[in-house]
Amino acid sequence: MFSNQYIQQRIHKANSLREEGKNPYKNGLKRSLTNAAFLEKYAYVKGLEEPKDKEKCESIVGRVKLLRLMGKACFIKIEDESAILQAYVSQNELNDEFKSLKKHLEVGDIVLVKGFPFATKTGELSVHALEFHILSKTIVPLPEKFHGLSDIELRYRQRYLDLIVNPSVKDVFKKRSLIVSSVRKFFETEGFLEVETPMMHPIPGGANARPFITYHNALEIERYLRIAPELYLKRLIVGGFEAVFEINRNFRNEGMDHSHNPEFTMIEFYWAYHTYEDLIELSKRLFDYLLKTLNLPSKIIYNDMEVDFNQTSVISYLDALETIGGISKDILEKEDRLLAYLLEQSIKVEPDLTYGKLLAEAFDHFVEHQLINPTFVTQYPIEISPLARRNDSNPNIADRFELFIAGKEIANGFSELNDPLDQLERFKNQVAEKEKGDEEAQYMDEDYVWALAHGMPPTAGQGIGIDRLVMLLTGAKSIKDVILFPAMRPVKNDFNVESEE
């Protein structure tokens, strides 16, 4: 692993430090200020007649980003999480320590500098070193002298390296953290209680997806990584909680692309004595809150598309297929005509697909990508909504919506099915679909039906994909850009290292 000549040179320098009685991985030294705090606190120094303040002494830490050696002195750019700060190190103050520094210090090393604030002739606020310590010797050279890491695969596989050399990546994940904390704060302010439900399920449920399977040795049974927390959260509504939410991971054993990762983060929330129409209004308030918190305008650009949050609309599923998808009503209303139309459009469909699934195929191909501004699509076919409440006026549709923004589904919500007998029949239909070969059809969950039989109040529930939400609000084009360690196909790592020169 460490046979590369450039790594060997650095290992030799680490061993040389040990021979001098210095630990190249020193511990226990503390900084007194972050780099940003130093720059703010001592900004006044640049205005002094003699731009220095020897009465002050601070310790700063960070990674060496740039090193300029000039005879008996050197300038070092040091980066911590907050900012980059320059240090000036001179042989006059450090004597033999300066010689050791020149011999051993390299770009990438993590250091501590203790000294007083001063400004250079060019007016740059810096720290004049009185002490200098290498805290962690880097034995692998960093790429391109911090000019950036452009290999996309390497960025995702070695995210630590990506974070070191690409500051904008760190900014994305700071924004992600702010988005998640803002979502949490919003729901707490709205009166929702945050809860935690199991990550391993005896029966996978809550969504149509293929699960990951594991094995519990003590119980001697298979367990499934959860594909959704929905059925457990609704059990809590049965138990008497009236407004709950959970932010956590879901796992779906499916394909990967720029908007899908098998391990992803969602918020799901359930609201007793409310309907899906209430969720639509709640979602609008959530986005208003997030835009304000992130200081984003109502119009944002995502993937070269202008998304206007002031142009939010609501449209029914069939109306969207007709007015946006361009499919006539007489085709949409007849299953055989719709199948023929899809085949004419060279869309590959299974011959035994139900009417509801044919509509879904048409929607995916002709409508979804055109929904740029926030669009709540309502009145979904009941056949593709096995957990949603049946509409009172039309039993063929569900009281359900999905929110689309920039051509992608962002949220899914509905008035919950709380009739245990209806739910049991729908589970039976799902089992029949699974027996026909539909691996994503849901399993029978008799325990959940039994819970419903104890009475669940009228409830509305919704899920929002956090990763896609972060993509939208940060402009990221791939879900891998907003997940710190995305799923990647394993490769043999040859640990190539190129010269820093």
Curated annotation (Swiss-Prot):
The keyword Protein biosynthesis applies. PROSITE patterns: AA_TRNA_LIGASE_II (PS50862). Binds 3 Mg(2+) ions per subunit. Homodimer. It is an enzyme of class 6 (ligase). This is Lysine--tRNA ligase. Belongs to the class-II aminoacyl-tRNA synthetase family. NCBIfam families: lysS_bact, PRK00484.1. InterPro entries: Aa-tRNA-synt_II, aa-tRNA-synth_II, aa-tRNA-synth_II/BPL/LPL, Lys-tRNA-ligase_II, Lys-tRNA-ligase_II_N, Lys-tRNA-synth_II_C, NA-bd_OB-fold, NA-bd_OB_tRNA. One of its GO terms (biological process) is lysyl-tRNA aminoacylation. Its cofactor is Mg(2+). Transmembrane segments: none annotated. GO terms for molecular function: ATP binding; lysine-tRNA ligase activity; magnesium ion binding; tRNA binding. The keyword Nucleotide-binding applies. Its EC number is 6.1.1.6. It catalyses: tRNA(Lys) + L-lysine + ATP = L-lysyl-tRNA(Lys) + AMP + diphosphate. Pfam families: tRNA-synt_2, tRNA_anti-codon. It comes from the Bacteria. Mg(2+) 1 binds at residues 402, 409. Mg(2+) 2 binds at residue 409.
